[in-house]
Structures are given as C-alpha cells and as structure tokens.
Amino acid sequence: MVPEQSLSVVVPVYNSEASLPLLIERLEPVLAAHAPSFEVVLVNDGSPDGSWETVSQLTERYSWVRGISLMRNYGQHNALLCGIRAARNQIIVTLDDDLQNPPEEIPKLLAKLAEGYDVVYGAPEEEQHGFLRDLASRVTKMALQSAVGAETARHASAFRAFRTEVRAAFVSFQGPFVSIDVLLTWGTTRFAAVRVQHDRRRLGTSQYTLRKLIRHAFNMMTGFSVLPLQVASVVGFVFTVFGFLVLLYVIGGYLLRGGSVPGFPFLASIVAMFSGVQMFALGIIGEYLARMHFRMMDRPGYAIRQQTAAVERAAPRLVAGMHA
C-alpha cells in the first residue's frame, strides 16, 4: 500500500478556459482518494483569453484551488517554476492543462515514487500530439540529453511527480531561461518512469509554434549544457586538420610534380570555409556571453501580477522557505 502524503498539483495555464473546469473535476476524486491534504496551483502564463477569470472562479468554488497570474507570457517552464515554488505539500505533481495527461494516472506516479525514487515521469504509452508537438518533444529530448544524459532524457515529460525536498537544489536559481527537468537533476539522481495513458486533445489547439520549438531547444542546449562549445571545438579541429592536409597536398604537388600552386579561386574557397567555421564558433561563444550578461542583470524568470487570497495567506511561509 502506498503511504499517503500531502500533494500539490501544479498546472501551467495558457488559453485553456474551456478545459480547466473539466480538469479540476477529474482531479478532485483522484486527489481525495490518495492524499490526506492536497492543493492545485494554477499558474496563468499571460493568457490573452479568459483563463484567469476561469481560474478565479475555480478558486472561489474549491477551497483547495489556488491561482497565480503572471505579468506576461514567460513560457511553460517559467510558469511551472513559479508554481513549484508556491507549492506547500510533500509531493509535487505537474501536468498540462489540456487533459492529455489523465489525472487518473497520478496514482501510478505516486506508487513508483513510494519505491524510493525522488522524481518519476509519466512516459506516454503512445503520444497523441500533433506534428509540431511531436517534433517539439523529440527535439527537446535530444537537447535534454546533453544536459542530463540519455537515460533521463528518454523518459522526460510534462507529467511528473517529485518530492518537495528536491526543490531545495534550485531554490535560489535566477534567470530567464528555465528547464524544470534540468533543475530537478541538480537535486537528485533517483529518477524513474512509468507508462501512462496519453489522450488526444479534445479542447482547443496546441500552443506550440515552430518559433517556440526552436527557442526552447536552443535554450536547453546553451542554457544548461556546454555541448555546443564542444561541437564547435571539434568542428574547428577537424577543419584545421583538413586545412593542414590541403596545404601538404599543394606543397607536395608543387615539389614532386612541379605543378603550379592553385590560384585565387581555390585559396578564396579555403579562406571562406575557415571564416565560416570561425563565425559559427564565435556565434556560439556570443550566445553564452549573452546568457551570462542576462544573468548578471538579474533578469527574473517571471513576475507575478496577482494571486488569489489563498496564495497571499501562504506568502510569508513561502518566502521564509525560499530564503532558508
């Protein structure tokens, strides 16, 4: 039997006014059956629709629902970080707002967590995303491998459960570029995954765009990994060796066969190739320098516009915990 512990469910909200009431209705019986106390933290990530109004209505109807509204759209992981820091219970569960992660699958994650793991992912038996979301998932996992390793990255998903103690590892993290999965690896190596059902999206449309996909994957690789720098170093080394071999070939041909040294077109192509490699490497270095610049500016990962009363009453406790 799984020992009961208090639960906090954190849900990033974006343009989901239609699905939120259904999500809460399905969460209530699951949480009531598996936790002595529980809460749901809905973080509105600058939704332009009526999502915040829906969140406010839900907090009035359910005493265990709390709401936070951010100043603008910061991104899913930034909103999650805000909600995770606001969570007050022993176990934190994160899931999307689109009902593709069935709340009824939460007990599977809790059961695996009870075996001694610190973080458990719900790995979909068969993903039911659209093309862009599937592509986003694949690219993100590839980028995540460079930061956390292939084993963890393979099972990473937005449906996860972890012990609140893990949060202590990134309680002082600051910066605009956030990856919850990388931050979790700062606190533990005890990861596991269980197979869960993954439903088709029936309400609304995916908010993933090609621009968001590229931005998140690039943030993953340059924000929490040195892989791009390593790749640039290897590419630079390979082209250096290539240039050296070309030089030997030209000199050898001139000395042994008496041939003429290739003219301007050949030399121009070699110079252009090496200049391109140098610019590529400088661009990557510049990206890292820019990120250092942003962190030195103390640019926050999110800013809160307003909170429901339940969150405001908990604020003194939260601040004390963050600065302990």
Each model region followed by its residue ranges:
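Hydrophobic helical membrane-anchoring modules
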Residues: 1-4, 179-324
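Short beta-strand/loop segment that forms part of the nucleotide-sugar
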Residues: 36-47, 68-69
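N-proximal low-complexity "stem/linker" segments adjacent to membrane-targeting elements
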Residues: 1-29, 35-36, 318
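Short aromatic/hydrophobic "clamp" motif used to bind/position activated sugar donors
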Residues: 92
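Acidic helix N-cap motif at the loop->helix transition within catalytic regions
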Residues: 18-21, 49-58
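Structural signature of beta-strand start/N-cap positions in the alpha/beta core
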Residues: 8, 37-39, 66, 118
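A conserved acidic beta->alpha catalytic loop
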Residues: 44-53, 99-100
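Acceptor/aglycone-binding surface of glycosyltransferases and processive sugar-polymer synthases
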Residues: 57, 64-72, 76-86, 100-183, ...
